[in-house]
């Protein structure tokens, strides 16, 4: 019973971390990375499909991504989708290959992205704390119903607190890493 609550909390906290990781991957740093474009939806025969499912995305050099569609007729729709994504990117097509050069970030844009990173990290921290609160409430319910003792409740709360601290430390680490990447010129 107690282990179920702890395991459930752990899996939910890990999902929050995964969500943060996904959100941070969408933010553009100075370096080219395929995750910048993977979430872009392309019109593939009238179905919105992620770019990663209709083309291969590769790093050509630190500031350029190259996209190779698996079908010739997808070059145009992919180019349009990248422009519509409003990432400030201008794709250039050479035959079947679409090259996407990444312009350097301005200081103002870097600061704005760093603020977004801090906001996303705070959302993740709040989600993790909410999970902790729910787990602690579940433990209190079990204690009120006399299914567990006070000592067991305290031990479980301590375990959940350690788990929470570890997850929040991971959030802080991910956020500071992303901020450092953003501020690197």
Curated annotation (Swiss-Prot):
GO terms for biological process: cytoplasmic translational termination; translation. It is found in: Cytoplasm. The keyword Protein biosynthesis applies. Belongs to the RRF family. Pfam families: RRF. Gene3D superfamilies: 3.30.1360.40, Ribosome-recycling factor. One of its GO terms (molecular function) is ribosomal large subunit binding. Disulfide bonds: none annotated. The keyword Cytoplasm applies. Its main location: cytoplasm. This is Ribosome-recycling factor. One of its GO terms (cellular component) is cytosol. Keywords: Cytoplasm, Protein biosynthesis. It comes from Coxiella burnetii (strain RSA 493 / Nine Mile phase I). Responsible for the release of ribosomes from messenger RNA at the termination of protein biosynthesis. May increase the efficiency of translation by recycling ribosomes from one round of translation to another.
């Amino acid at each position: 019973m107690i282990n179920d609550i702890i395991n459930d909390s752990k899996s939910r906290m890990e999902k929050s971390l995964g969500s943060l990781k996904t959100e941070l991957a969408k933010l553009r740093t100075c370096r080219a990375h395929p995750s910048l474009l993977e979430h872009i939806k392309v019109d593939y025969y009238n179905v919105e499909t992620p770019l990663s499912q209709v083309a291969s995305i590769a790093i050509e050099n630190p500031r350029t991504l190259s996209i190779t569609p698996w079908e010739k007729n997808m070059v145009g729709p992919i180019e349009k989708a990248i422009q519509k994504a409003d990432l400030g990117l201008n794709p250039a097509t050479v035959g079947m290959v679409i090259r996407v050069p990444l312009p350097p970030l301005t200081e103002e844009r870097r600061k704005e992205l760093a603020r977004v990173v801090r906001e996303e990290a705070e959302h993740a921290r709040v989600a993790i704390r909410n999970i902790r609160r729910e787990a602690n409430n579940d433990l209190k319910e079990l204690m009120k119903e006399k299914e567990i003792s006070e000592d067991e409740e305290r031990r479980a709360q301590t375990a959940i607190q350690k788990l929470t601290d570890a997850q929040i430390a991971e959030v802080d680490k991910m956020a500071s890493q992303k901020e450092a990447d953003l501020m690197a010129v």
